[in-house]
């Protein structure tokens, strides 16, 4: 028989959203850092070789 599930608390929802937001901000910072590194024509980014033309 179908039984409704318990509702997720607001604090748990907020905690999960904050965790997701922090992860996305970290990824954005890394992307910006790589872009800056490439525009400054450095040869390596995080031990990866980037070929510049």
UniProtKB/Swiss-Prot annotation:
Sorted alphabetically, the Gene Ontology cellular component annotations on this record are:
chloroplast; large ribosomal subunit
- Its name, as the record gives it, is Large ribosomal subunit protein bL32c
**Any Pfam family matching the protein:** Ribosomal_L32p
Q: Which UniProt keywords apply?
A: Chloroplast, Plastid, Ribonucleoprotein, Ribosomal protein
Q: Which family does it belong to?
A: Belongs to the bacterial ribosomal protein bL32 family.
What the entry lists under InterPro entries is as follows: Ribosomal_bL32 (IPR002677), Ribosomal_zn-bd (IPR011332)
GO BP terms in the entry = translation
The reply on keyword Cytoplasm is: no
Q: Where in the cell is it found?
A: Plastid, Chloroplast
